[in-house]
């Protein structure tokens, strides 16, 4: 493996944050400098955490996942007040979801090692599975290439109610068939059988979406010491009761802080992402097997426009008796994470960094400082045949990441003829319009009744010129089919659906091509935290 770093222009909050823009930096509590991390460590030492209770739960959960000895040792180390975490999270996508989930885990593992070395204290990697998320449609699919087209393969396991991913049961039989269909689109290799067996073993040990996800991640990162936490685990909820009570009792302060911070973000020229009602409580409650967002109305806490209603006392009693019925929303999830874990750094994707910029004052409501927010590593894989295609087309390795491939393709095709096709036809259309405009004026002077027909005549001539242009382009494309197929392969491999590779493709393709140790080898590479895009040549 060889890594090439490419500077890819980023827009909005994350782009300015990486460039250390002074304005957006004020929306975060720590600079990403050695001094910033040391200050964070100092601040954490003045905080109290329920370490022993957390360790007991994490040991039980990770042992169920058959985590390796390095993970168990890291969990046990958390009982020590001088142990801290690098943390990040994601939804429980089927087959681990898009590549960026794996890349986020790699980022967490890498940064934990680096911070342990630079800060001189124990730092362990933690991945937070967003098990409370109830939008199964966001995690129930993957993309493949089939019949030379990109196809979305959906696992049809419909849930009519808004059940969390931690509680959404998964049919092993149906999911096995779905996985078989996915692997039929991959070339059979020396690794295919082992990879399928690896996935099947994880599936057969699972009963829910989160189970399946957690077992795959545990296996893929077996020797890294990675600790997993399911944010919707009933035993974890028991540790969260006291903080849920604080959220409920201070919801007005939370909403005011969110509003004030969003005003600052607006003043800096950014559009806020988080949308909430003024009476939002920022807590979900499970009612009749459905996840219901709570709101305040006339002194009551209501759900579904008043269908469900609770007094403050009733809600607190319900929390104490059944904490597993409660979960966080986008505003309070980071707060709960901060309450539970002594976090030396949070790893976030572009979207997360944008919405975290809106939460600074919300953290301060609870006397928390927002942890250092570190952009996750971004990675693309470039296979040998793709590198060959690039060179054949006289493109630079960075071109697919910084330029529009469709425009590069059109430019290449135009260069295959002596004169630019589009310019020639544009010129012809303009000349024709000038001639026809003069002709229409002449016709109109002699017979005004033909004015409408003359207009139609012009449009038909225009259509015929456009038809001729299309036919010429089609013939050119057929003539240069071999080269244009190379552009298509580049597009599918590196910019599928016009998006970054890591937002579309799944890790299973690469496991099938390069073996079960593929993720381990990628994790062991050296990366820069300077905002560049890492292209790994395979």
Curated annotation (Swiss-Prot):
InterPro entries: Bacillithiol_biosynth_BshC (IPR011199), CC_BshC (IPR055399), Rossmann-like_BshC (IPR055398)
Keyword Coiled coil: yes
GO molecular function: ligase activity
Broad class of enzyme this protein falls into: ligase
Keyword Magnesium: no
Enzyme Commission designation: 6.-.-.-
Pfam families: CC_BshC (PF24850), Rossmann-like_BshC (PF10079)
UniProt keywords, alphabetically: Coiled coil, Ligase
Coiled-coil intervals, chain numbering: 421-485
Family from the record: Belongs to the BshC family.
Function: Involved in bacillithiol (BSH) biosynthesis. May catalyze the last step of the pathway, the addition of cysteine to glucosamine malate (GlcN-Mal) to generate BSH.
NCBIfam families in alphabetical order: thiol_BshC (TIGR03998)
Protein name: Putative cysteine ligase BshC
């Amino acid at each position: 493996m060889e890594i090439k770093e490419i500077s890819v222009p980023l827009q909005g909050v994350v782009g300015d944050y990486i460039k250390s823009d002074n304005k957006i930096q004020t929306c975060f509590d720590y600079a990403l400098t050695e001094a910033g991390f040391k200050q964070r460590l100092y601040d954490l030492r003045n905080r109290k955490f329920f370490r022993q209770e957390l360790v007991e739960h994490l040991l039980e959960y990770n042992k169920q996942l058959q985590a390796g000895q390095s993970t168990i040792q890291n969990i046990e180390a958390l009982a020590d007040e001088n142990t801290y975490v690098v943390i990040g999270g994601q939804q429980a996508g089927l087959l681990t979801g898009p590549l960026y989930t794996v890349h986020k885990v790699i980022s967490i593992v890498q940064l934990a090692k680096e911070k342990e070395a630079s800060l001189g204290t124990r730092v362990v990697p933690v991945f937070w599975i967003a098990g409370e998320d109830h939008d199964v449609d966001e995690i129930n699919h993957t993309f493949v290439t089939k019949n030379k087209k990109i196809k979305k393969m959906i696992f049809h396991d419909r849930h009519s109610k808004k059940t969390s991913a931690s509680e959404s049961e998964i049919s092993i039989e149906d999911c096995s068939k779905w996985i078989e269909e996915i692997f039929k689109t991959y070339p059979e290799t020396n690794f295919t059988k082992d990879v399928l067996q690896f996935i099947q073993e994880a599936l057969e040990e699972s009963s829910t979406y989160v189970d399946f996800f957690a077992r795959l991640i545990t296996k893929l990162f077996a020797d890294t010491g990675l600790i997993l936490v399911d944010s919707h685990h009933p035993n974890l909820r028991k540790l969260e009761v006291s903080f849920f009570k604080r959220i409920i009792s201070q919801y007005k302060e939370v909403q005011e802080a969110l509003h004030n911070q969003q005003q600052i973000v607006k003043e800096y020229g950014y559009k806020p992402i988080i949308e909430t009602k003024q009476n939002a409580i920022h807590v979900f409650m499970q009612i009749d097997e459905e996840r219901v967002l709570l709101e305040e109305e006339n002194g009551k806490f209501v759900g579904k426009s008043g269908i469900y209603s609770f007094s403050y006392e009733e809600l607190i009693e319900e929390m104490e008796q059944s904490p597993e019925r409660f979960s966080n929303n986008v505003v309070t999830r980071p707060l709960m994470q901060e309450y539970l874990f002594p976090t030396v750094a949070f790893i976030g994707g572009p979207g997360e960094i944008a919405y975290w910029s809106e939460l600074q004052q919300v953290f301060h409501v609870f006397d928390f400082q927002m942890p250092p927010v570190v952009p996750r590593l971004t990675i693309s894989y470039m296979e040998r045949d793709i590198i060959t295609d690039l060179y054949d087309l006289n493109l630079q390795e960075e071109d697919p990441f910084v330029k529009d491939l469709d425009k590069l393709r059109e430019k290449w095709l135009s260069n295959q003829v002596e004169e630019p096709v589009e310019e020639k036809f544009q010129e012809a259309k303009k000349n024709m319009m000038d001639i026809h405009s003069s002709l229409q004026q002449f016709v109109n002077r002699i017979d005004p009744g033909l004015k409408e027909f003359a207009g139609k005549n012009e449009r038909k001539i225009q259509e015929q010129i456009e038809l001729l242009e299309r036919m010429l382009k089609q013939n050119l494309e057929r003539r240069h089919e071999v080269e244009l197929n190379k552009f298509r392969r580049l597009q599918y491999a590196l910019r599928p659906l016009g998006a970054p590779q890591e937002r579309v493709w799944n890790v299973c393709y690469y496991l099938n091509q390069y073996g079960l140790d593929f993720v381990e080898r990628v994790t062991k590479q050296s990366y820069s935290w300077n905002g560049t895009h890492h292209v790994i040549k395979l």
